Amino acid sequence: MASRYLLGFDVGSSSVKASLTDVDNGEIVASAFYPDHEAPIMAVKTGWAEQDPQMWWDNAKLSLRKIMAESGAKGEDILAIGISYQMHGLVCVDKNQQVLRPSIIWCDSRAVPYGEKAFHDLGEDFCLRNLLNSPGNFTASKLAWVKDNEPELFDKIDKIMLPGDYLAMKLSGEVKTTISGLSEGMMWDFNQKKPAKFLLDYFGFDESILADIVPTFSVQSVVSKAAAEELGLKEGTPISYRAGDQPNNAVSLNVFNPGEIASTAGTSGVVYGVLGDVNYDPKSRVNTFAHANYTTDLDRLGVLLCINGTGILNAWVHRNFTPDVSYADMNDLAASVPIGSDGVKIIPFGNGAERVLENKEVGCSIRGISFNKHNRAHVVRAAQEGIVFSFCYGMEIMQQMGMDIKNIHAGKANMFLSPLFRDTLAGVSGATIELYETDGSAGAAKGAGIGAGIYKDHNEAFASLKKLAVIDPDEANRSAYLEAYSAWKEEMKKL
C-alpha cells in the first residue's frame, strides 16, 4: 500500500517548521525547521519589526527538503497541505504578485496611533460591537501607516495578505484569505458578517485590496506547476487549511467547541478559549477573533489572552538566581518552598506593555522579600506563581464574558514542563490541565486533512492525539492556592 501523508507548515518569526503526518495512524513521520538559529528581524527604528517574506518561502523550502529526505516521501505521497502562521503581519504585493516591501510583523508597534485614532473617530462602542476589538496595532492599522508614509508604494499595491496567505500564494499562484484571517487584521464586521467596509472606508482602502475569501477548511487552491517543480511536490495537490498560530494551536489540541480552552506558555503565554456567541471585553484587555471553524452560519469565536511576561521571566530568574542548575533542578528547588512562597510575590509584567492591564507598562517587581527569611528558592517559586496568577487574572475577564473554564488543553512544552507551574494553575483556576503531544505544523497538516475531506471531521483527524498527563486541582491545598492568589491581587491594586 502506498504511503499517504499530509504536509503542514508553521511560519513563525524565528523559523519555518514543516511536518509530515501519516494519514492512517496520525503519527508524525518527520519534522524539521529552518533556520536552526533565530531568523533575523529588521528594526530600522525603535518599535519597528520587519521580515522579508521571501525568507519565509526560502525557509519553507529548506525545511520541506529536510523532511522529504528524512522520510523518503515522494511528492505524490502528499495528499494535502496546511499552513499555520504568525498572526497580524502585513504583506503587500503588486499585480505580478511581487512583494513591494518587507512585511510589518506582529511585534511592530508603529501603527498604534493609527488604530487609536480610528477607535476614537469611529466610536469605541461601535468598533467593539462590530470588530469586537479596537483597531489597535493590527493589520489594517499597519496598512494605514503604509498609505500615510509610503504613498507611492501604496498606490502599487494590488493585494494585501497575511504571512500564511503569502506562503499559499507562493505554492499556488493564487491570492486567498479566510474570515479568521480578516478578523485578526480587524477587517471583518461580525454584525454584517462581511468585510468591515466602514473601517476600510475610514482608512481610504478600496475593498478590492483584500484577497478573495475561502473557508478555513476547504480546498482553497492547489499547488501550481512552477511550485511543484521547485519543491518536488505533485502539481494539483490541495492547499486545504490555513490559520493563525493561536487558532491553529487550539486546532492542534482539538479545541473547537464553546467552553474548550487551549494554552501555551513560551516566552509569552496565551490562554485561548472558544465562545459560541459574539462577545467582547469592553476594555479590550483580551481579544476576540473568528476561530478556525467560524462561518457566517456558525458563531465560533476565539478569545485570546496574552501575557508577555511568561517564560521570559522564568528564564530571567534562571539566569540571575540559579545559573548553576538545570531548569528541572530549579523546579525542584521551588517545590521546597510552601504555596505562596512565604509571602514573596512577583508581578511578572516586565516584557513591555500588557494588554490585560489596558496596555500599561508597569514593569516587573519582587515584593515581600525579607533578607533574614527568604532565599533564591522563594524567588523561583514566586516567579512561577506570579505567572500563573497573571494567567488567572486574565481568565477572570474571560469568565466575565461567559466562558466556563473547566479544562485547559496544552502541549507538554515550555512552562508546562514544570510540575509546580501545572499544579499551581490547576489549584488556582480549579480547572483540570490536560497535556498532549502536539505541534503547530502537525496540527496544520491534520487541518489540511479535514479541509480536503480526507477526514470526516476534527474528531477523526485528532483521534490519535496523545494525552500525556492529566493534572486535577489539588482540593486539599485549594484554599492555600486561593489565599496566595488573593494576596497577589492585593499587590496588583497598588500598581
Named regions from a protein language model:
Residues 1-101, 117, 156, 211, ...:
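N-terminal glycine/serine-rich phosphate-binding loop of ATP-dependent small-molecule kinases
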Residues 7-8, 20, 112, 116-176, ...:
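Active-site core segments that coordinate phosphate-bearing ligands/cofactors
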Residues 26, 36-39, 89, 98, ...:
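Surface-exposed, flexible loop/turn segments at secondary-structure boundaries
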Residues 26, 52, 81, 108, ...:
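Residue-level signal for inorganic ion chemistry
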Residues 34-36, 215, 473:
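Active-site donor-binding loop signature of nucleotide-sugar glycosyltransferases
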Residues 47, 69-106, 132-137, 168-189, ...:
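Short beta-strand-loop/turn "lid" adjacent to the catalytic site in phosphate-handling enzymes
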Residues 54, 58, 137, 218-221, ...:
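Conserved phosphate-coordination/catalytic loops
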Residues 203-215:
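A conserved helix-loop-beta module that forms one wall/lid of the active-site cleft
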